[in-house]
Regions:
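A cross-taxonomic marker for long C-terminal extensions/tails that follow the last structured domain
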Residues: 99-103, 108-116, 127, 131-141
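A structural signal for short, well-ordered beta-strand segments and their strand-loop junctions
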Residues: 62-64, 91-95, 130-136, 214-216
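Chitinase-like catalytic core of GlcNAc-active glycosidases
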Residues: 1-114
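A structural motif corresponding to the C-terminal end of an alpha-helix
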Residues: 55-58, 83-91, 122-130, 200-212
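Acidic/aromatic/glycine-rich contiguous surface patches that form carbohydrate-binding/processing clefts
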Residues: 201-232
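Glycan-binding loop/region signatures in secreted carbohydrate-active enzymes
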Residues: 128-201
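Short acidic, glycine/proline-enriched helix-loop-strand junctions
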Residues: 71-89, 170-177, 222-232
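Short catalytic/ligand-binding loop motif for oxyanion handling, primarily in non-cytosolic enzymes
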Residues: 11, 140-144, 221-224
């Protein structure tokens, strides 16, 4: 499913939206809570979101809420889940915000462990029918050593500039590509996704029974054709 990263929670329990083409229909709406004050009227905001889903023909809404879970955010999701279900829509939530009736999103942008173990553990815990992939496009620069495991996000032009002329390799454990470089005497490990790695993540999820996945627009706009080749 294509997800439109264009909505956020605003002051006064209002739904704010970036400009979208009036004729845009279908896909999912992504709800960000970045820099949002407490939601004081979750029922009213939930109704706004549901109305927008119906007006735009969205199949549902995905909550892109930062951890940790906050009581006001959970209250909104608890109002929204049955409201969307009554309209034949789906609510997608991050693992730290589980609510009854919602589908849990699993982020596939890993920097350690294995993706197969991650998905298998989630299937065992929640059941494949309650899961969907959050197919984030990974592009991260990790200085080595990196004890905290936190890298620096890269834009696509930055990634392309760093990768130019360098051999890249595939990590089967992470289902991602990588290369190394040395800058100012320090070694860097750059991990990234392309259409092939994202497709491999989809294939692995399907093997485990996870049939639903979200890709974000405009994040993967340049990969849509190779990513979904043969899907129609």
């Amino acid at each position: 499913r294509l997800a439109h990263v264009a909505y956020r929670l605003g002051p006064g329990s209002e739904l704010l939206a970036a400009p979208l083409p009036p004729a845009l229909r279908g896909g999912l709406m992504v709800l960000s809570d970045w820099d949002c004050p407490p939601v004081e009227e979750p029922d009213r905001l939930a109704r706004q979101i549901a109305r927008t889903c119906l007006r735009r023909g969205y199949a549902g809404a995905a909550a892109n809420f930062d951890p940790p879970a906050r009581p006001d955010r959970l209250a909104l999701l608890e109002e929204l889940s049955p409201l969307l279900a009554s309209c034949g829509r789906t609510l997608y939530v991050p693992e730290h915000c589980p609510v009854a009736g919602a589908t849990i999103l699993l982020c596939t942008a890993l920097s350690g462990g294995t993706l197969e173990d991650r998905l298998t553990q989630a299937v065992d815990q929640y059941g494949a029918e309650h899961l969907a992939l959050d197919l984030q496009r990974l592009a991260m620069d990790f200085p080595l050593p990196c004890p905290g495991g936190q890298g620096t996000p890269l834009t696509l032009p930055q990634l392309e500039a760093l990768a130019a002329g360098r051999p890249t390799f595939y990590s089967d454990a992470l289902c991602a590509r990588y290369f190394t470089l040395t800058r100012q005497g320090q070694t860097h490990f750059v991990l990234f996704d392309d259409a092939r790695t994202l497709r491999r993540k989809l294939e692995l999820a399907r093997q485990l029974g996870i049939r639903d996945a979200l890709v974000m627009l405009p994040e993967v706009e340049d990969l849509l054709e190779p990513l979904f080749a043969g899907e129609r």
